[in-house]
From Swiss-Prot:
Organism, scientific name: Bartonella quintana (strain Toulouse) (Rochalimaea quintana)
GO cellular component: cytoplasm
The protein, known as: 2,3,4,5-tetrahydropyridine-2,6-dicarboxylate N-succinyltransferase
Gene transcribed to yield this protein: dapD
Disulfide bonds: none
EC nos: 2.3.1.117
Pathway field: Amino-acid biosynthesis; L-lysine biosynthesis via DAP pathway; LL-2,6-diaminopimelate from (S)-tetrahydrodipicolinate (succinylase route): step 1/3
Listed GO biological process terms: diaminopimelate biosynthetic process; lysine biosynthetic process via diaminopimelate
Amino acid sequence: MTNLTQLEMIIEKAFDDRDSIKTTTKGEIRESVEHALNLLDKGEIRVAERQKNGQWHVHQWLKKAVLLFFRLNPMQIIAGGVNGTYWWDKVPSKFSNWQETDFKKANFRSVPGTIVRHSAYIAPNVILMPSFVNLGAFIDEGTMVDTWATVGSCAQIGKHVHLSGGVGLGGVLEPLQANPTIIEDHCFIGARSEVVEGCIIREGAVLGMGVFIGKSTKIIDRTTGEVFIGEVPAYSVVVPGSLPGKPLPNGEVGPNLYCAVIVKRVDQKTREKTSINDLLRD
């Protein structure tokens, strides 16, 4: 197959002419899109990569490949439902045609009720409780995805992360220019928290239960007063909070507005030695 540079060129050109691409399209375009998704599925390439300077580089062409996949493939019966029922979709399961040897080689745990779509990568020693992992996502080694957590399209999850029950990580296929949601290594995301809109949770950070982080969320360090937008600093401990409301026209106190509050910052050694509950205690 073509190298990655050629693959990118073919997919970029095809995406520019995407209105002409149909389920009947064959040849180079179909082969390139399928090859790109297979590479994503194996973890040989990924939608976003962390650079040496700590910044994340997003390969937009891979997101385009995922979108082209929808144009190239018709709806189809997908087996595996409860009591022999089916689903109706364009994207097969990651586990289609897998046998015992495939699971042993992949070396991660997938509990019944888990859904992982083709092109998502799951690294060794990951534990997937009944959860949903969407296209193009990357989940690195030793991470726990707890019950009813959702990992959105192209989300990037680091090593030894804990996504608690009901956590939601947003997907970013559209708008196309959006960056993926990123959770770096050794983070803990508390139950029912949401991280969306391409926000980054930096290494070792702890989000308490019910923290919501989007691009408009103010993340306030209560010690320094510093305000962060779109990114939680490394080794921060974050809980839900609120900002005082502005006075209403009649002079009454207005409603408070949601924010996230950094209650403390810890170093790596403290983070490793201290339990999550102790970190979250004020």
